[in-house]
A protein has these predicted regions:
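Short, charge-rich amphipathic alpha-helices with coiled-coil/heptad character
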Residues: 19-52
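Extended, charged low-complexity scaffolding/tethering segments
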Residues: 1-27
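Long amphipathic alpha-helical coiled-coil segments
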Residues: 66, 71-74, 105-137
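Amphipathic alpha-helical coiled-coil segments
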Residues: 51-61, 98-121
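Extended, amphipathic alpha-helical coiled-coil scaffold segments used for oligomerization/tethering
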Residues: 63-106
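Short acidic DE-rich linear segments
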Residues: 1-3, 135-140
């Protein structure tokens, strides 16, 4: 995979993170108004479920990427095993590592996105607790 494709993936994931950050900040701002709490509750729950769906999708993509890396590792190992020059194990590993660098970079981007999405779900869970506490204070 070329650097342009990796850069495009990074930009797409970054845009997704920015969009979710804006959404979560908007939800946090809506916690200030007790009169619109019903809408806020629905939006928090809806956003949380959408994030969970995206986590599932990213998990599938990570599994696919790991499968691709494993297959390419096997192919590269066989190629360097049958190489014209005798290579030591460390040399083979270095060559294979270089061959798989782009695939590993993609995997790293996907895993970082997964971690970020999981943290965002935790943030929305905490908002749910904040809503509950806010409503409990109102009833006092």
């Amino acid at each position: 995979m070329s650097n342009e494709k990796i850069l495009a993936l990074d930009q797409k994931l970054s845009a997704q993170r920015q969009e979710w950050s804006t959404t979560i900040r908007g939800l946090a701002q809506s916690l200030r108004n007790i009169n619109t709490m019903e809408i806020t509750i629905a939006d928090v729950l809806s956003s949380r479920q959408t994030l969970v769906d995206q986590i599932a999708y990213i998990n599938v993509k990570i599994k696919q990427q790991k499968k691709t890396i494993s297959a390419r590792y096997r192919e590269a190992y066989i190629r360097y095993y049958e190489y014209d020059y005798k290579l030591g194990e460390k040399q083979k590993e270095k060559f294979i590592e270089n061959d798989l660098a782009d695939d590993n970079m993609i995997l790293s981007h996907l895993e970082n996105q997964l971690d970020w999405l999981k943290d965002s779900v935790k943030t929305l869970d905490n908002m749910g607790f904040a809503i509950r506490n806010r409503l409990a204070l109102k009833d006092l």
